Design a protein with these regions (language model features):
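Active-site loops and adjacent core secondary-structure elements that bind or stabilize anionic groups
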Residues: 34, 43-346
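Metallocofactor- and cofactor-centric catalytic cores in central/energy metabolism, strongly enriched
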Residues: 38
Length: 346
């Protein structure tokens, strides 16, 4: 990083130099330099940083880094800064100390995503899980359910993506990443790929389902789907994104919210049902929360995998904890979903 800052170059040029100078790969120095030239961006400064890094690595100036072991202090719940926050933290105190750090961050995420009522909803769901938690491994069932429940409740819909893109501190971070001077102008181009399903997720459930089933409406909405490149530093695009971000206040009445929370309810129900008869199975089902991730096609694939597991469990089959663990492992290891489908059918 110091070499990159010294030369005003991107970090990848320094990393390539260190990699080339170490000799761990069977490629010549010239082949690495050719790649930097091919990129065609700030070639001179990046080549200089590459050369400096190469020289240091090839002369034995790079040694194995042994990070110092730093003991993290025990987590303490911060002081509330508002009456609404104080009410939430008081509710958090009803949970075991081993759970509070994860649940606190979940609360923080829910408030940022929606509002304080949403954070209360998060704790209410977990209170039912805690009542069935036998306490093993420092209430691991409650902790892991809380970890993935927060992520799922804060699913990335169009308002959430727009909220991220228009945060006040974001332009400063972009300026820092591209090494732009404080008085230097730059453009920011964002890549969006909205799907018909994501547009319909903003509508009330009845209307959204109607539009999804209508071929005429689908043809019209397809005009707004596909890859889009938008300059978010322009006034019109920024204001449009701010408008979309503001739609989150109506999120509870949207099709997407209803759809996601119906699936969340099924997952939590499966976890609670298993907790009373097979705690290990309950833990594995709670860990299945990590399957649901991403946006667009990735989101559709991962949620379908979660639902496939829940359907098998809900069918009353005698599913073992190890079986669920294997299914989850296959789903996480293969983005195509083929390995998961084969394991599920076995």
């Amino acid at each position: 990083l110091a070499l990159a800052n010294e030369h005003g170059a991107v970090i990848s040029a320094v990393l390539l130099g260190a990699l080339a100078g170490s000799g761990v790969l069977p490629f010549s120095r010239e082949s690495f330099e050719a790649e930097i030239r091919k990129a065609g961006k700030a070639v001179d400064v990046n080549m200089a940083a590459f050369a400096a890094s190469y020289q240091r690595a090839s002369s034995g100036g790079v040694e194995q880094f042994e990070p110092a072991v730093v003991e993290e202090p025990d987590f303490e719940v911060p002081q509330a800064t508002s009456s609404a926050g104080a009410e939430l933290l008081q509710k958090l105190e009803a949970f075991p100390e081993s759970c509070r750090e994860i649940l606190y961050h979940g609360l923080d995420k829910c408030v940022d995503y929606q509002d304080y009522a949403y954070a209360h909803q998060y704790l209410d769901e977990l209170r039912d899980v805690l009542a069935l938690d036998d306490g093993r491994e420092d209430n691991r069932l409650t902790r892991e359910t809380g970890r993935y429940l927060a992520l799922w409740m804060c699913f990335e819909d169009i308002p959430r993506v727009a909220q991220f893109k228009t945060r006040a501190a974001r332009m400063g971070k972009v300026r820092e990443e591209v090494l732009a001077e404080s008085d230097q102008l730059f453009d920011v181009t964002e890549f969006f790929r909205p799907r018909v399903e994501e547009i319909c997720s903003l509508l009330p459930p009845g209307l959204g389902n109607y539009v999804l089933k209508s071929s005429v409406c689908n043809k019209f909405l397809n005009l707004f789907t596909g890859g889009k490149q938008l300059r978010t530093n322009t006034v019109t695009v920024f204001l449009a994104l701010r408008f979309l971000a503001g739609l989150r206040r109506f999120r509870r009445g949207m099709l997407g919210y209803q759809h996601e929370h119906a699936m969340i309810g099924r997952w939590l129900s499966a976890v609670r049902d298993a907790a009373g008869r097979d705690p290990e199975l309950a833990l594995e089902l709670a860990d299945c929360g990590r399957l649901v991730k991403g946006y667009g096609d990735t989101r559709a694939r991962t949620t379908s995998q979660m639902l496939a597991i829940l359907q098998r469990v809900e069918a009353g089959e005698n599913i073992a904890a190890d079986t669920v663990r294997q299914w989850r492992g296959k789903a996480l290891a293969d983005d195509s979903g083929e390995a998961f489908s084969e394991a599920l059918a076995a």
